[in-house]
Structures are given as C-alpha cells and as structure tokens.
Regions:
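Amphipathic alpha-helical interaction surfaces in cytosolic regulatory modules
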Residues: 23-95
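STAS-typified acidic loop motif
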Residues: 2-34
C-alpha cells in the first residue's frame, strides 16, 4: 500500500520548519516539489529547515527534489537545513 505524503509547518524559535511525513517517490514528487517551492518562496531570506525524520521512503527522484529545494533556497538568500536521523538517508545526501 502506498503511503501518502503530508506536511506541516512549525516554528522553532526564529526558524520555520517544514515537517514532511510519508514517502517521497515518483508518485509523490510533484506534490513534494510544490510543498518545498512554496515553503522556500514564502520564507525567502530566512534560515529554514526541512524535517525529514518522518519520511519512510526516499527514492532518487525524491533526493533530486530535496536538493533542488536547497539550491532554490540558496538562490533566494535562505539557508535550508535538512533534519535527518536515518543513517542510510543521510548517506544519500552525503551527510
């Protein structure tokens, strides 16, 4: 059974955090991309984070969309931090 992707935005002090939960794969990448684009654009020039601790699956298309968001944030004058506690997932990002 395919798990949907969900998101919420929380404030952690001065930082806004986009919390992603579920699977980021070929089926959910368009939705994930839209979420990330809106989040980055809405917080341009700020320190922001994407919390991926509740992400249960991540394929290559998902890695690509996350890296695209990091680049978009940098272009917008933001610093985007990834919050990942799964070692395998951290390795996929070279962390």
């Amino acid at each position: 059974m395919h798990m949907q992707l969900s998101s919420s935005i929380i404030r952690d002090g001065p930082q806004s955090v986009l919390v992603l939960a579920g699977e980021i794969d070929l089926a959910t990448v368009p939705e994930c991309s839209d979420m990330l684009t809106k989040f980055v654009d809405d917080h341009a020039g700020s320190d922001i984070a994407v919390d991926m601790r509740q992400v249960t699956a991540l394929d290559d298309t998902g890695v690509g969309v996350i890296l695209g968001a990091v680049s978009r944030a940098r272009t917008a004058g933001s610093h985007l931090a990834l919050v990942i506690d799964d070692q395998h997932m951290r390795q996929r990002f070279g962390l």
